[in-house]
Amino acid sequence: MILLISDLHLEEKRPDITRAFLHFLATRARQAEALYILGDFFEVWIGDDGMTPFQHEIAGALRELSDSGTRIYLMHGNRDFLIGKRFCREAGCTLLGDPHRVQMNGEPVLLMHGDSLCTLDVGYMKLRRWLRNPLSLLILRNLPLATRQKLARKLRNESRAQTRMKASEIVDVTPEEVVRVMGEYDVRTLIHGHTHRPAVHELEVNGQPARRIVLGDWDRQGWALQVDGEGFNQAPFELTPA
């Protein structure tokens, strides 16, 4: 069994999500061969050198799961793209590129965070290209922690304000880009997060039936996609552990 989650946006202000995630790690995730976290795991990440006690606690919980035998794979999101090797060593997880092609249930599957698919959001795409540029990343990682904290708050506040103002189709994925990327990587199944719109979308890629599975965000409830002999099945669950 493989589990995939995304968009937990972990932060100290949401202890309900943290409790549910720690419960998830100690129970359901222990039964999995692998756990994939496809971005926006944390609400904000200013660098491994700025880890808080809360973030160390999360890393420790992941390490316990990893030590129990479950492989953990982590992908950057738009909120936590500064997660680096130090955190991954502490947490016992492997950092994946975006996109990442993997075999699941005997078929090639493409994993993405999903923000790079929102090509109609021109302003965000320009910002993303700048932020993910290796030179920009080097500059960001070497800024004083206080400066990074201010910048993170500014970017987060602007993102929230702009998202409220933009039309829903602009902040969702662009269908043509989905087809292009799936064709480029020669897959019939794409799994991503980012949009907070859990669903399974049927489409056609190069004349063949295909599907796009959108992971749910953890807010009013949690979400996990389970891949096993019965297929790809996603379901919500209550945040308060029973």
Swiss-Prot record:
InterPro entries: Calcineurin-like_PHP_ApaH, LpxH-like, Metallo-depent_PP-like, UDP-diacylglucosamine_Hdrlase
Cofactor notes: Binds 2 Mn(2+) ions per subunit in a binuclear metal center.
Name under which the protein is recorded: UDP-2,3-diacylglucosamine hydrolase
Binding site for Mn(2+) 2: D40, N78, H113, H194
Any GO BP: lipid A biosynthetic process
Annotated GO CC locations: cytoplasm; extrinsic component of plasma membrane
Residues noted as binding Mn(2+) 1 in the record, renumbered to the chain: D7, H9, D40, H196
Main location as per UniProt: membrane
UniProt-listed Pfam families: Metallophos (PF00149)
Family to which the UniProt record says this protein belongs: Belongs to the LpxH family.
Gene3D superfamilies with a match to the protein in the record: 3.60.21.10
Record keywords: Cell inner membrane, Cell membrane, Hydrolase, Lipid A biosynthesis, Lipid biosynthesis, Lipid metabolism, Manganese, Membrane, Metal-binding
Role description: Hydrolyzes the pyrophosphate bond of UDP-2,3-diacylglucosamine to yield 2,3-diacylglucosamine 1-phosphate (lipid X) and UMP by catalyzing the attack of water at the alpha-P atom. Involved in the biosynthesis of lipid A, a phosphorylated glycolipid that anchors the lipopolysaccharide to the outer membrane of the cell.
EC number: 3.6.1.54
Enzyme class name: hydrolase
Cofactor(s) recorded in Swiss-Prot or TrEMBL: Mn(2+)
Taxonomic source organism: Ectopseudomonas mendocina (strain ymp) (Pseudomonas mendocina)
Pathway, per record: Glycolipid biosynthesis; lipid IV(A) biosynthesis; lipid IV(A) from (3R)-3-hydroxytetradecanoyl-[acyl-carrier-protein] and UDP-N-acetyl-alpha-D-glucosamine: step 4/6
Membrane protein topology class: Peripheral membrane protein
GO molecular function, one term: UDP-2,3-diacylglucosamine hydrolase activity
Subcellular location: Cell inner membrane
Name of encoding gene: lpxH
Reactions performed catalytically: UDP-2-N,3-O-bis[(3R)-3-hydroxytetradecanoyl]-alpha-D-glucosamine + H2O = 2-N,3-O-bis[(3R)-3-hydroxytetradecanoyl]-alpha-D-glucosaminyl 1-phosphate + UMP + 2 H(+)
Residue sites binding substrate per the record: N78, R79, D121, S159, T163, K166, H194
